Regions:
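Nuclease-adjacent, charged terminal/linker segments that flank catalytic cores
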Residues: 1-117, 284-315
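Non-catalytic C-terminal interaction segments of nucleic acid-processing enzymes
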Residues: 1-35, 168-315
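Short acidic loop-to-beta-strand element that houses the catalytic metal-binding Asp/Glu
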Residues: 112-114, 120-131, 143-149
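Short, solvent-exposed loop/turn segments that connect beta-strands within catalytic domains
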Residues: 134-141
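Eukaryotic short linear interaction motifs
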Residues: 136, 153-156, 225-227
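A short secondary-structure junction signal
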Residues: 141, 156-159, 228-231
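A general structural motif
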Residues: 141-142, 213
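Short beta-strand-loop-alpha-helix junction that forms the active-site gateway
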Residues: 148-169, 186
Length: 315
């Protein structure tokens, strides 16, 4: 295992040296939300693995949190306004998914929306997105479940913590030290996608069964997009339905390397995209594995302690 490096620290990219990054104070404001403090002790927003971005903070890509505690009455919840950053992200998603001509006033969202499931489990959509009239003459669904998964957890997280503590305590600290490779740490795409699969099946079904049938959009980071594509690329021919009646979209959120390198957050963009049929994609997901005759034949242990060799044909 090679390692990872810190890409963003409390909203500041680490790969530029124009502005010296200093250790964050407890309760510093989150740079990606309005009126919210950073909840992390070590405020790393994203890391790089083999040069590709992996988001490790739930608020970095586009937080769906809709309320905040009243500072004067903690039992009371106040509506949390969307930040300018969140609005830009959501507008870009809408432009790619519906029409490139949309403006802020055309797009409407609901956040943390409860969804019904047969097993009584609690599910909620990150966002429900539609146009302000609730319907559209454009191709694709009128309304969609919108899910955000820019990354997830890492292995050996303690190594990242130790690196950040050593950097913070170093009186000669620099951005270069902050972005040094942290060995023996990796991203865990398998866990990130495994956690999302149940959500994917339930929320996608809810969207398709509602009214005349809606759709679902997954915004995922570059490494997760790579992982999902490897799972299904040889399992099915997925129709490209961007200009037709798509019910599922995968949008890759990646670093916009064409933008100038200036202090602040890393600029993001929508890279690869897949607009297709939800049911066809589900079939590709479950159509994993191949016939494994050797697994069902050969030497078996009998319960009396002896062994028996069973042939493939059962005789």
């Amino acid at each position: 295992m090679a390692g990872v490096s810190v890409a963003e620290y409390l909203g500041q990219r680490t790969d530029v040296d124009d502005l010296q990054i200093n250790p964050a104070v407890v309760g510093a404001p989150c740079p990606f939300m309005d009126g919210r403090k950073c909840h992390k002790k070590i405020p790393v927003c994203s890391i790089r693995n083999k040069g590709k971005l992996w988001i490790v903070c739930e608020n970095r890509l586009c937080s769906s949190k809709k309320t905040i505690s009243d500072p004067f009455n903690p039992r009371r919840k106040l509506k949390l306004p969307l930040s300018s950053y969140q609005k830009k992200v959501l507008l870009e998603i809408a432009r790619v998914s519906f029409s490139p001509h949309l403006q802020f006033e055309h797009v409407a969202v609901k956040r943390e929306v409860p969804l019904k499931a047969n097993d009584q489990s609690d599910y909620s959509a990150d966002f429900i997105m539609t146009l302000f009239e609730g319907k559209t003459a454009l191709s694709g669904p009128d309304r969609v479940v919108l899910e955000m998964q820019g990354g997830g957890e890492t292995s050996n997280t303690g190594e990242i913590t130790r690196h950040l503590i050593a950097w913070a305590e170093n009186p000669q600290r620099t951005n270069e030290i902050l972005r040094q490779e942290i060995p023996k740490v990796g991203t865990i795409e398998t866990n990130a996608w495994r956690r999302q699969q149940e959500q994917f099946f339930v929320k996608g079904n809810v969207a398709l069964m509602t009214w005349k049938g809606y759709g679902i959009i997954f915004c995922v980071g570059e490494l997760l997009y790579d992982y999902i594509w490897r799972k299904i690329e040889n399992k099915a021919v997925l129709p490209t339905l961007e200009e037709h009646n798509w019910t599922l979209a995968f949008l890759e959120i990646c670093e916009d390397e064409e933008q100038p390198s200036t202090p602040g957050p890393l600029p993001l963009k929508i890279g690869r995209r897949l607009f297709t049929n939800y049911q066809t994609f589900v079939h590709a997901l479950i159509n994993q594995g191949e016939p494994s005759l050797d697994a069902f034949a050969g030497e078996f242990d009998r319960l009396d302690g002896s062994t028996v060799n069973i042939q493939r044909d059962g005789y």
